[in-house]
């Protein structure tokens, strides 16, 4: 694992997976927002690093720039990139990497590197917006620290603005190592946005503490930050130890749909396993999807009632680990084949097992 003192370091497999998720999501996020009614969108990388790894692989800032640059559609909206890096040597190297990309970037791209902490740099951006009575443009904030130097209050403030989203790396292994250290109490209070994390110190057994701290952060996103949709994704290593969680927060169902698409498309990483960890009673491995679990969830939610295809789709996207692409062929069609559901108002000529019409009502028996 990289040291906080290194200027560049080796790209590890679990980081490669994270970068692939970021690239896939930005490929969807940029056109959705920039082709809409917004004149500007903002991408923030709060712990940007040097922009390159020791093997020459691109870092997250370069991945973001290329994902936005390589869109197939023409984008006229201003796309601002704010890359924050506290280490001066890394920030300087990042500037060099961006300069190498600059000739290929469109004129509507605005790129800025700030050599400061995430708290100071982006806190200043938020404060400036507030002082001027301005709104933060639609923002995707990628917050990927080495440890826990991320004030929860800032995450919550970002989410008060319309069309803003966060992807936060929750470095569980490092957090767990220092959770009982007396010198870190105030830092953990800031990170969790409360003092409740202290209850996890006395928990016996690593799995209990893991779940407690995960659930506390998720609860804070839901209740303190008032984020409508929150999902967490877990990366485990070959020793079955949680390396990190990714917490994704959005108030937009379409954003959640696209993030889940990105997560599910990540290839198996050999010694690492990637899963949706939102529901403690149902961890869903992306490499081994169990559609019987989705069928059970749909049945539990709608059994004995009627629902439209659109109702079911919103439930699958918003409240399960599964994708929009999963529920028709893998759940509704086999349920209709065995008589567990039946269409209430099928249009003339409808083929059994087809659900293109979202207003189609289905009766669950």
Residue locations for each model-derived region?
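Class I S-adenosyl-L-methionine-dependent methyltransferase catalytic core
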Residues: 1-365
């Amino acid at each position: 694992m990289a040291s906080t003192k290194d200027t560049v370091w080796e790209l590890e497999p679990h980081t490669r997976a994270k970068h692939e998720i970021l690239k896939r999501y930005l490929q969807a996020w940029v056109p959705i927002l920039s082709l809409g009614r917004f004149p500007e969108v903002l991408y923030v990388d709060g712990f940007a690093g040097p922009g390159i790894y020791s093997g020459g692989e691109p870092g997250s800032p370069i991945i973001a720039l290329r994902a936005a640059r390589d869109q197939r559609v023409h984008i006229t909206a201003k796309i601002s990139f704010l890359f924050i890096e506290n280490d001066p040597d890394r920030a300087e190297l990042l500037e060099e990497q961006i300069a190498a990309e600059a000739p290929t970037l469109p004129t509507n791209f605005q790129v800025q590197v700030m050599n400061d902490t995430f708290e100071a740099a982006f806190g200043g951006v938020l404060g400036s917006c507030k002082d001027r009575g301005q709104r933060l443009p639609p923002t995707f904030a990628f917050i990927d620290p080495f440890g826990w130097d991320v004030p929860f209050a800032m995450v919550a403030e970002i989410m008060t603005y319309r069309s803003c989203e966060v992807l936060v790396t929750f470095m569980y292994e490092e957090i767990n190592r220092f959770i009982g250290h007396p010198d870190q109490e105030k830092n953990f209070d800031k990170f969790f946005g409360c003092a409740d994390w202290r209850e996890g110190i006395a928990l016996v057994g690593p799995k209990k503490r893991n779940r407690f701290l995960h659930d506390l952060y998720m609860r804070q996103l839901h209740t303190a930050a008032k984020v409508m949709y929150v999902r967490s994704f877990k990366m485990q290593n070959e020793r079955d130890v949680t390396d990190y969680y990714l917490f994704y927060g959005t108030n937009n169902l379409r954003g959640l749909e696209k993030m889940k698409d990105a997560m599910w498309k990540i290839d198996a990483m050999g010694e690492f396993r990637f899963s949706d960890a939102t529901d403690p009673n149902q961890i869903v491995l992306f490499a081994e999807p169990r559609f019987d679990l989705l069928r059970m969830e749909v049945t539990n939610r709608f059994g004995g009632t009627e629902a439209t295809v659109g109702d079911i789709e919103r439930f699958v996207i918003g409240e399960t680990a599964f994708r929009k692409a999963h529920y028709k062929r893998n759940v509704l069609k086999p349920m209709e084949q065995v008589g567990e559901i039946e269409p209430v108002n099928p249009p003339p000529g409808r083929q059994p097992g087809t659900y293109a019409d979202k207003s189609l009502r289905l009766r669950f028996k």
